[in-house]
């Protein structure tokens, strides 16, 4: 168990640093946070590639923990959401995939709003 936690932690260390660097390098375009978009897209690609490769070839658990859970987890949680949505699509559950997208996007926006409301209530 300690080994697995270390793999996740070290992967997360590198994922967080990569997120910081990429977010700082990519300029804001069209008034949108394109740095965040960039890391979300990169993380989604990496996790999708890793997990879909594992359907066709054995990928060691250590790689999945280090790259998938650690690196991509720190880089973005959006990668897991994207992969899970495509699993629903692959299983022919298009309605559930669309519902997953709607709930995640709208739900996360609502939670940010609630966090904002709480922070303003505390610090104003």
From Swiss-Prot:
Under the heading InterPro entries, the entry gives: FluC
Q: Name one GO molecular function term.
A: metal ion binding
Q: How does it sit in the membrane?
A: Multi-pass membrane protein
Would I find Nuclease among this entry's keywords? no
Keyword Nucleus tagged: no
Q: Name one GO cellular component term.
A: plasma membrane
- Chain residues that bind Na(+): 73, 76
A GO biological process this protein is involved in?
cellular detoxification of fluoride
The residues that cross the membrane are 6-26, 37-57, 69-89, 92-112
Compartmental location:
Cell membrane
Q: How is its activity regulated?
A: Na(+) is not transported, but it plays an essential structural role and its presence is essential for fluoride channel function.
Major place of localization? Answer: membrane
Which keywords does this Swiss-Prot/TrEMBL entry list? Answer: Cell membrane, Ion channel, Ion transport, Membrane, Metal-binding, Sodium, Transmembrane, Transmembrane helix, Transport
Which chemical reaction does it catalyze?
Answer: fluoride(in) = fluoride(out)
The entry's function note states: Fluoride-specific ion channel. Important for reducing fluoride concentration in the cell, thus reducing its toxicity.
The family assignment reads: Belongs to the fluoride channel Fluc/FEX (TC 1.A.43) family.
Q: Which HAMAP family is this protein grouped with?
A: FluC
* Name of the protein: Fluoride-specific ion channel FluC
The protein's organism comes out as Methanocaldococcus jannaschii (strain ATCC 43067 / DSM 2661 / JAL-1 / JCM 10045 / NBRC 100440) (Methanococcus jannaschii)
Q: What is the lineage of its organism?
A: Archaea, Methanobacteriati, Methanobacteriota, Methanomada group, Methanococci
């Amino acid at each position: 168990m300690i080994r697995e936690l270390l793999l996740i932690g070290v992967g997360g260390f590198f994922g967080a640093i990569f997120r910081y660097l990429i977010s700082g390098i990519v300029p804001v375009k069209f008034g949108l946070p394109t740095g965040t978009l960039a890391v979300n897209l990169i993380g989604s690609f990496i996790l999708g590639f890793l997990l879909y490769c594992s359907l066709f070839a054995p990928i060691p658990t250590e790689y999945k923990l280090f790259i998938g859970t650690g690196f991509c987890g720190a880089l973005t949680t959006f990668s897991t959401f994207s992969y899970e949505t495509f699993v629903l699509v692959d299983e022919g559950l298009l309605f559930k995939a669309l519902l997953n997208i709607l709930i995640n996007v709208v739900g996360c926006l609502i939670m940010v709003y609630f966090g904002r409301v709480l922070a303003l209530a505390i610090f104003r």
